[in-house]
Amino acid sequence: MSRGAAGWCCLVLWLPTCVAAHGLRIHDYLYFQVLSPGDIRYIFTATPAKDFGGIFHTRYEQIHLVPAEPPEACGELSNGFFIQDQIALVERGGCSFLSKTRVVQEHGGRAVIISDNAVDNDSFYVEMIQDSTQRTADIPALFLLGRDGYMIRRSLEQHGLPWAIISIPVNVTSIPTFELLQPPWTFW
């Protein structure tokens, strides 16, 4: 093998390892499936924060997705006890994405999913960025379309449930297209 070919071979072998070690970045999608309640048993698409937060090192087969109270999660959470070791669903607005992520992290959450506060948003992903402070967050932070967040919250309210049960992350490449349970209100 020539010296140039050996160099390219090393690069090709190293690149997938580098991507796997660093996880998803902006414009990558992460998928999760709601397992319960059944009326929203769909696979949802989210995007990771651009320059803060951690990555998923574990696949959670069943974990609670707990809507934060208050929904904007800019301070103390009245249901913070339920967020410990679970994933919080919060709404955009009131404070920075990083501030919301830190509030959930301080309550022991494993990750935060921040849905757009524009409930009619069914196609535009917002780029979540650092807030120019020196603060950091270690848990994954994901952005969810406003329509998706609204539909999850609405279903929980209709059923009188304090949380949804989800599986995250979901590898959609291993699911046949006809089996993908996509929300009927969202274009893929």
From Swiss-Prot:
> Could you tell me what this protein is called?
Protease-associated domain-containing protein 1
The protein's job, in short, is: Plays a role in the modulation of physical activity and adiposity.
Alphabetized, the UniProt keywords read:
Glycoprotein, Secreted, Signal
Q: Gene3D superfamilies from the entry? A: 3.50.30.30
User: Which chain regions cross the lipid bilayer?
Assistant: none
The listed locations are: Secreted
Q: Which residues are glycosylated?
A: N121, N171
Stretch forming the signal peptide = 1-21
**Post-translational modification (record):** N-glycosylated; required for efficient secretion.
Pfam families cross-referenced by the UniProt entry:
PA
Q: What induces it?
A: Expression in metabolically active tissues is significantly suppressed by refeeding.
**Recorded GO CC terms:** extracellular region
The consequence of inactivating this gene is: Mutants born at the expected Mendelian ratio, and they appear normal with no gross developmental abnormalities. Knockout female mice fed with high fat diet have reduced weight gain by elevating physical activity and energy expenditure.
Tissue expression pattern: Expressed in metabolically active tissues such as liver, muscle, adipose, and heart and different brain regions like cortex and hypothalamus, expression is acutely regulated by the nutritional state.
Per UniProt, residues of the PA domain are 83-163
Name the lineage.
Answer: Eukaryota, Metazoa, Chordata, Craniata, Vertebrata
